[in-house]
A protein has these predicted regions:
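Conserved NAD(P)+-binding/catalytic subdomain of aldehyde/semialdehyde dehydrogenases
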Residues: 169-258
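C-terminal core of ALDH-fold dehydrogenases
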Residues: 315-428
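Short loop-to-beta-strand entry elements in the cores of soluble alpha/beta enzymes
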Residues: 203, 223-234, 250-273, 291-302, ...
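Conserved small-residue-rich beta-alpha loop and adjacent elements
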Residues: 99-165
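N-terminal Rossmann-like NAD(P)+-binding subdomain of aldehyde/semialdehyde dehydrogenases
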Residues: 1-115
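Short acidic-hydrophobic, aromatic-tinged amphipathic segments that line or gate anion-handling sites
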Residues: 2-8, 174-179, 301-306
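Flexible, glycine/charged-enriched surface loops at secondary-structure junctions
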Residues: 92-98, 220, 257-262, 282-294, ...
Length: 428
């Protein structure tokens, strides 16, 4: 086997984690002490926003009235597809059931949505409108009754109007002008008159991700997210221009967004390495600055001898987004095991999934695709078991449970069976 790195990144997604953790821990302690006032102070400090936190119904109606129809149509287009996909997931997800395990002993499970979901919608460098669709729509379809949304406000404006419109359209019950760690803390602790969130979902920067990590346990979370990632598997049949722009398309997210190419074609690799900087140079300032740093520090081009080598290294990376642009699409589709979301063929691209094609864009990063998938209706639903039984069935179950408990040395456990056997007229 011969795997050769034509470009190797000098940094990893975990770079600077220690500093981030220290900053986030201090912010969380500050909010725990100062509560809502602490959130407001941090909103003023980081976002330069000094207005109301809760977006009023009047404000939402004003935004709905003022937002241009084309934007509303596009949001509705995305919402419809994400809703349909979530409904299909729900229909094919586990079912409530009850089964008789032995004479008189019944057991089953119920699928029960969480009561309150907190959805974080980033709006720092970019206004991530689609994140509102992905999180709120999926929670709504899952049956969550109370959906909170927090999004970073702009000075004298509040949350981005299209994000407010989108969150409201998709079913948010409360929208807050609050971003960053303070938003995560507010939803977790039930501040500003809201119920505490049972689960937090949505992407965010490293500080948001670290806040979710620290608070996990007190509140459920969708996943431990890091900077967004893309990997592309391509062979000599791939279009170098499309491969290059797809890598750049994800690199523009931020300075630490990995972009990886796995290929068996040296010719394709050389063309992509040459073309990526040219495409980056053509971008506006903010995405150009982000993409330049991301490609320089986190971009990789890996040359392999065989398709099997490519599949193996891809599964080792377990990328968040994985595109396959090869002649042998079905082989890769069946062979690949570790990724957040798979984009099969040149016709589709990460941006489609990110924005409006229907699959969810809240996905595992930093190799977490080895053990989990992305956000789906099941993240908002608890699978809870139950049992019931007749008095007659206690004769066998009670006696067996008592004996097993005594084997383990747990006498009080055993006596909970003994007392029932005695009450119902059975000997042990």
């Amino acid at each position: 086997m011969a795997i050769k790195y034509l470009k190797k990144s000098p940094k990893t997604s975990s770079t600077d984690d220690t500093k981030t953790r220290e900053i986030v821990e201090n912010i969380l302690k500050d909010i725990e002490k100062k509560k809502e006032e602490g959130c407001k102070e941090l909103g003023k400090k980081f976002d330069k926003y000094d207005g109301e936190i809760i977006v009023s119904k009047e404000k939402i109606e004003q935004i709905k009235k003022n937002l241009d129809q084309k934007t509303k149509d596009d949001v509705q287009f995305s919402h419809e597809r994400v809703r349909k996909f979530a409904e299909a997931q729900l229909k094919n997800y586990g079912q409530d059931f009850e089964v008789e395990l032995s004479d008189g002993l019944y057991a089953g499970q119920k699928l029960i949505p969480v009561n309150t979901a907190g959805c974080y919608v980033p709006a720092g460098r970019y206004a991530h409108i689609a994140s509102a669709v992905m999180s709120v729509t999926t929670a709504k379809v899952a049956g969550v009754k109370n959906i909170l949304v927090c999004s970073s406000p702009k000075p004298n404006v509040g949350a981005h109007p299209t994000i407010v419109y989108t969150a409201d359209l998709c079913g948010a019950d409360v929208i807050m002008n609050l971003g960053g760690v303070q938003a995560i803390a507010a939803m977790t602790n039930g501040l500003f008159g809201n119920a505490p969130a049972d689960i937090l979902v949505g992407p965010g920067n490293q500080f948001v991700a670290e806040a979710k990590r620290i608070l996990f346990g007190k509140v459920g979370i969708d996943l431990f997210a890091g900077p967004t990632e893309i990997a592309i598997i391509a062979d000599e049949n791939a279009d170098a221009e499309i491969v290059a722009i797809d890598l750049v398309g994800q690199a523009e997210h931020g300075y630490n967004s990995p972009a990886w190419l796995f290929t068996t074609s040296k010719d394709l690799a050389d063309k992509v390495i040459k073309r990526v900087p040219e495409l980056i140079a053509e971008l506006p300032e903010l995405p150009r600055t982000n993409a330049e740093a991301a490609w320089r520090d986190y971009g990789e081009v890996v040359l392999c001898d065989t398709d099997e080598e490519i599949a193996s290294i891809s599964d080792d990376y377990a990328p968040e987004h994985l595109e396959v642009q090869t002649k042998n699409l079905e082989w890769f589709h069946n062979r690949l095991k570790n990724y957040g979301s798979l984009f099969v063929g040149e016709e589709t691209t990460v941006a489609y999934g990110d924005k409006c094609s229907g699959t969810n864009h809240i996905l595992p990063t930093k190799g977490a695709g080895r053990y989990t998938g992305g956000l789906f209706v099941g993240k908002f639903i608890k699978t809870l078991s139950f049992q019931r039984m007749t008095k007659k069935s206690t004769e066998l179950v009670g006696a067996a449970a008592a004996r097993l408990s005594r084997y383990e040395g747990m006498e009080a456990h055993a006596r909970t069976g003994d007392v029932r056997l005695k009450k119902y007229g059975f000997s042990n």
